């Protein structure tokens, strides 16, 4: 009887070990998924700050069978976004022209001090 009892205890411990491993694995998978989601949100946020359309970013990162050929369009170069920005921010009107004129006026000097553009 003692043999059966020890066998029973051994099986019980083995079962508990399997259950414990399963719970640890489940917890590990949850943490991995959470880290992945946080990483995706961070990446989408970074791309959004760079001026990419958040919806396009989401489609590209998460993936969508309906739109497999989605390409990111930079919102800063999107004429409709630029026009809307100019309407709501009058102070920014002509900013591209100002930047272009600034770039044109910048002189580049070589080591001998001669300017060249």
UniProtKB/Swiss-Prot annotation:
Compartment annotation: Virion; Host cytoplasm
Domain notes: The N-terminus domain points away from the virion surface.
Chief place of localization: virion
Pfam family, one: VP2_lagovir
Protein name per the record: Minor capsid protein VP2
Family per record: Belongs to the lagovirus VP2 protein family.
Sorted UniProt keywords: Capsid decoration protein, Capsid protein, Host cytoplasm, Virion
